[in-house]
Each structure stands twice: as C-alpha cells, then as structure tokens.
Amino acid sequence: MSTSENTPFNGVASSTIVRATIVQASTVYNDTPATLEKANKFIVEAASKGSELVVFPEAFIGGYPRGFRFGLGVGVHNEEGRDEFRKYHASAIKVPGPEVEKLAELAGKNNVYLVMGAIEKDGYTLYCTALFFSPQGQFLGKHRKLMPTSLERCIWGQGDGSTIPVYDTPIGKLGAAICWENRMPLYRTALYAKGIELYCAPTADGSKEWQSSMLHIAIEGGCFVLSACQFCLRKDFPDHPDYLFTDWYDDKEPDSIVSQGGSVIISPLGQVLAGPNFESEGLITADLDLGDVARAKLYFDSVGHYSRPDVLHLTVNEHPKKPVTFISKVEKAEDDSNK
C-alpha cells in the first residue's frame, strides 16, 4: 500500500459518465474483521455493476454507537462506562494500519475509488474519519470530522484543518463532509473552493429533513452529493449486557428499525438520481454525468462569479494542531545558531 496526499490529476475526467454506488448497511458491532468481510462483499457487488466509486456510511468500520450510554452524565463517572469505551476503542482502527492495508487492497482488486467511514484511534483518542482509496490500491488519505455532534464530543476528538482534502482524480474531484459537518456553511465553502465535484456525505442521520440538506448542498455547491447512511435493526446490535442501549431502544423488538438509512444520490441540478432508501440494506447506484457540474454553475458558482470576496472572505487554517511539539537537540542547536 502506498499513500498519496492531494495528488493532482491535472486534467479533465477520462469519461463524462461515472457510475457511483452507495452502500447502505449495518456495521457488525464489536467485530471489525467481520465488518471488513461484509464491506468486501458489497464492494465486489458494486464493482460487478460497473461502479467506479463506492461510498460507505459514517463509522461503518468500528460502528456508530447509537444509543450507547458510556456511563455519561454531568459529574458522573462509573466503571460500566469505562468498560464500554474500552470495547469501543478495541473496535476502532489505526490509520495507517492493517485494516487500512486491507481496504486499499479491496479498492485495488476491484478497481474502484473507495470512501470508507471508520472510527480511527490515535493512541487513546478516537476520531470519526472518512478514508479515501484509489483503484491502484493506494490509501490516498483521510478526513477527520471537525465537529462531533452532541454526546459524540465525549467519545470522539475533533479533527483539524490538515485533513480536509479534495482529491483531483480521473473521475472527478473527490472529498467528504461527515454527518452534521454538512450543516457547517464555512466547511462546505472550503470544499467548494477546492473544486469538489463528488461530494461524499457519510452520515448517521436518517431523518426526512436530511434529504432537504443534501438537496440544498448539491445545488449550492454545484456538485454531486452522495449521502451514505447505515440501515440497522435492533438485532444488528449485540444483546445485553454486551451492548447497552438507552431506554427508548431497549423497548424495541429485534426486527425494529434503529437506523432507517435514507441514502441518496443527487445531481448538481437538484435531481434525485437514486434513493432515498428507507427500507433495507443494499446498494444505491447511479450514473453521474460530470457535465452537469458545468451546467449547474452557469447560473451559480458560490466561490466564483456568484461570490463577493470584497465583502465576505473565508480563511482556512490547514496546519495540524498537535498538543505537544518536540524539538530535537539538532534542531535546537540550528535554531540557536541563527539567533
């Protein structure tokens, strides 16, 4: 596996039509190897349909901890919550790491661009991350969710500006915003300014209102929006005591829907090309005419002819934000000699 950060394609897409597939499916909770095998089956199926781009939901690897307690409460600390976090941390993956190697292999073997939602562990801090892979079996890089939502902030760290890539590829300019990051106008604007054409939106939001957000972003950004959400039943989660839901979910029957999906593909002209699917696990596939990007931007280009930088201007800090910086003795000596 090799990595490539923001590698420019420096050209137009090799074809004006790109077939893209969204995978709407549930994580195999507390079992990352089984989740990877499930991902493999869906990737193979999508590739057999001629798809060049495959997008998975938020936190597909590692799992979205819907309904988890983690013992949280203001001023509350308990052993049950700590042990829940221990198990959740064990399901997360290192980036890079063996699971990333496996995903790169799957992308290369099936000749697809792959966008995978994963829970990344960096030491003992977790991040909600989107991973990008090329048909050549390369790990292109990652985007860490900038702002976890609500109680997600108690279990996930915040990404920084160093991981907001848009990759210039033969099938279009590819990037991602995760779940409610899509409600952050300034982050969307940063992606638009990087020329995003294939706007991937891995999410855990299966609400009807989410569809309105996706439609707006497609029109606002003049880009294709590919929103992937998990479809989960209560029986997809472990039973007590291995998985402890909040009371509302505890009342549900095994076949009751816990996450209803709603995955959808929308064109830059605001046309729903596939989905939304609120019924089951499965694939959602559409052919994307990249010429629609130019057609849409005739009338509206939010970071071009329809912008007013003399009045409104955005500055994006892409420097990594680390809590500790170590300066070696050699670097310190060189720094002292320059004073």
From Swiss-Prot:
Induction trigger: By indole-3-acetonitrile, abscisic acid (ABA), salicylic acid (SA), sodium nitroprusside (SNP), salt stress and dehydration stress.
Gene coding for it: NIT2
Pfam family, one: CN_hydrolase
Reaction(s) catalysed by this chain's protein: a nitrile + 2 H2O = a carboxylate + NH4(+)
Keyword Cytoplasm: no
Annotated signal sequence range: none
Similarity comment: Belongs to the carbon-nitrogen hydrolase superfamily. Nitrilase family.
GO MF assignments: indole-3-acetonitrile nitrilase activity; indole-3-acetonitrile nitrile hydratase activity; mRNA binding; nitrilase activity
Biological source species: Arabidopsis thaliana (Mouse-ear cress)
Record domain CN hydrolase: where: 18-290
Cellular component, GO annotation: cytosol; plasma membrane
E.C. number: 3.5.5.1
GO biological process: indoleacetic acid biosynthetic process
Record-annotated active site: 58, 145, 179
Keyword field contains Membrane: yes
Modified residues (N-acetylserine): 2
Keywords tagged on the record: Acetylation, Cell membrane, Hydrolase, Membrane
Protein name from the UniProt record: Nitrilase 2
Subcellular location: Cell membrane
UniProt main location, coarse: membrane
Bilayer disposition of the protein: Peripheral membrane protein
Function: Can convert indole-3-acetonitrile to the plant hormone indole-3-acetic acid.
